[in-house]
Amino acid sequence: MKIRRARSSDLRRITSIDPWPRASKSRHAWIGASIRARTVWVLASGTAVKAYAILTRSFFQRPFIEQLYVANEDRRRGHGETLLARMEKLCLRHGEVWTSTNQSNRPMQQLLKKRGFIRHGRVTGLDKGDPEIFYSKRLSRKKPVRA
């Protein structure tokens, strides 16, 4: 497995694993624009995209993981955690990273808790009946002290 920036040729691969861009032209266009802006990262095995993440500075100029998606058939294999850990590493110089997920997305909430993210609150009205929950994590280059 390799994590790399997405290329224009990955758009079709990304939309093949995530049903939202196939169902929404605007979401498809958003992912394409994000690839051109060099904010999309993929976890790939050969030419197959297993997961992708979109990392921007769109949240009050803070690093924000706008999207993290793992292909259905590749879930529960650690791909989400691997990609999330890389996004954290990319944000080290900023000292923090933010993200959000729907209240209904329990697996992502569990992953964020496992990785040490702190829950800050929720916003209603973005997805009808499914509030968005916001999280952040302080990042440090310091290595843990061993006893």
Where on the chain are the PLM-derived regions?
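Conserved acetyl-CoA pyrophosphate-binding loop and the N-cap/start of the following alpha-helix
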Residues: 74, 78-86
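Conserved active-site tyrosine of GNAT-family acetyltransferases
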Residues: 111-113, 117
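Conserved GNAT acetyl-CoA-binding A-motif
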Residues: 91-103
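Acetyl-CoA-dependent GNAT
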Residues: 5-67, 71, 84, 90, ...
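A short, internal acetyl-CoA/4′-phosphopantetheine-binding micro-motif in the GNAT/acyltransferase core
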Residues: 68-75, 101-102
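Conserved short alpha-helix immediately C-terminal to the canonical SAM/SAH-binding motif I
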Residues: 83, 105-108
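Conserved catalytic-core motifs of GNAT/GCN5-like acyltransferases
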Residues: 100-102, 118-134
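Conserved N-terminal entry element of GNAT/NAT acetyltransferase domains
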Residues: 1-9, 141-147
